[in-house]
Structures are given as structure tokens and as C-alpha cells.
Amino acid sequence: NYKYLHYFFDHYRNRKLIKKDFPDEIWIENTNHCNAACVMCPRELQSRKKGIMDLDLYKKLIDEISLHKDVVKRLHMHNFGEPLLDKKLPLRIKYAKKKGIKHVYFVTNASLLTEKNSYDLINCGLDEFKISFYGVDKESYNNTMINLDFDKTLSNIINFFAIRKRLKSKQPKIILQLIPNSLTVNKVKEKWLNLFNKYIDHSIGDRFN
């Protein structure tokens, strides 16, 4: 999507580079497997072998990061894969929080946000996650997020909020990301608000936040 890429290019190209002894935001890719084939995603172009990060290697990285926990503002647990395909994700998050990492975060398509995963993510100390939900109805969603199902994912999201409310927890916070397709922004905004407004904590999209 040219408009989407152009927005990020404009956003980052004029930012001043600052040299630091240790980065304040860190990405750890726990897996590069994904169960979706979104039409705009370039992940299939990657030549790297697909897999899940070894737990001992992960702990070694977290141990090193924890030495700079006063500097690190956020740990991103994602990159080209779907983090929830890693069954040890809650364990990894719990370890990072135990080591004093301030803010642990990841991006998911929420198709695997089952009841068990919902409980585990709430109880492991996760601070926040973003849901990529590219569609405002069954047709637009299923045509964009190939291999996933609109009704199932929507049900997962609604059930997650019900579980979080039942546990009387305010964490993790949820951000919903929506990328409009051929629909106009106003129509997308109206449908999107009707669909999610009573559930989400924050949202980002195409010029409406």
C-alpha cells in the first residue's frame, strides 16, 4: 500500500540519529513462522530458515538486556512472524518481566488468541500488545488476511476482553491497527468504531487515532 509506506517514510526520514551506548528499544523475534498470508506483507521474500528461538538463547539475551534495564524502554517480541505460534511466549514474557524489563510488547493477528492464551498473557505480566486487524467486515478481512477468519478472530478479541474484565486486570493494554483498503476513510472509521469502540484501549489507523 503506497499511501501507508509513504506515511512511514515521511515520519522517519527527518528523524535525527542519536548514537547511544545501548538501544532503548529492542526487538527479539521469537519466531518467524506465520499462519497468515496477508496480501501486503513481504515476509515470504525472506530467505532465512523458519523456526522458533531457543529458550536458553532467549534467556541469555534477556540477561544481557536486563543489565541495561534502566535504559531499555520497551522490548518488542515480534518481527516477521506470529508470536503466538510460540507456545513458550508467556514463559518468555514472564522471564523478561522477572528480570526487570519495563515494557514488554508484541504484535499479533489474534487468530490464536484462545482462552488459554488469553489467561496466560494476562497472568504472565505482558504490558501491551497490538492486534493487526485489516478489515472492517468479513469480506474485506478475509480477502486481506489470507488463511484467517474474520468471525473467529473477532470472537477471540471479544473473549479476551471478557476474560481480562473477569480477572479485574487492566493489563495487557490493547492497540488495534487497521489499514483501510478500497473503502473510503470515513466509511472505514464509522464501521471500525461501531465494531470495536467498546472493547479496545487504543487504536491506530489511517489518520484516525
Spans of model-derived segments:
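Conserved alpha-helical substructure of the radical SAM core
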Residues: N1-E128, N143, D151-S155
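Radical SAM enzyme [4Fe-4S]-AdoMet core and its adjacent flexible, acidic
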Residues: E29, G51, K99, Y119-N209
